[in-house]
From Swiss-Prot:
GN (gene name): hfq
InterPro entries the UniProt entry points to: Hfq, LSM_dom_sf, Sm
Positions of the Sm domain: 11-71
TM segment ranges: none
The protein's name in its UniProt record: RNA-binding protein Hfq
Organism of derivation: Caulobacter vibrioides (strain ATCC 19089 / CIP 103742 / CB 15)
Pfam families assigned: Hfq
GO CC list: cytosol
Purpose: RNA chaperone that binds small regulatory RNA (sRNAs) and mRNAs to facilitate mRNA translational regulation in response to envelope stress, environmental stress and changes in metabolite concentrations. Also binds with high specificity to tRNAs.
Length: 82
């Protein structure tokens, strides 16, 4: 796999929940709980949307991200046995 096509787990996860509009609960390092849907992200922040309002959350402030439903990060290959 070439270097420009390789994506890290964080970007793969955030892109997946963004595309599927999966509701998330985000816990910050100070204990604050935020809920919403990811509408955009980059290397430093996440744009969370809820009830027509947007919140820009810096990634260094995030402790945990919990999706409301399971997230499939890859397509299982047809010849995979497990």
């Amino acid at each position: 796999m070439s270097a420009e096509k390789k994506q890290n787990l964080q970007d793969t996860f955030l892109n997946s929940v963004r595309k599927s509009k999966t509701p998330l609960t985000i816990f910050l390092v100070n204990g604050v709980k935020l809920q919403g849907v990811v509408s955009w992200f980059d290397n430093f922040c996440v744009l969370l949307r809820r009830d027509g309002q947007s919140q820009l959350v810096y990634k260094h402030a995030i402790s945990t991200i919990m999706p409301a439903q399971p997230v499939q990060l890859y397509e299982p290959s047809a010849d995979a046995d497990d």
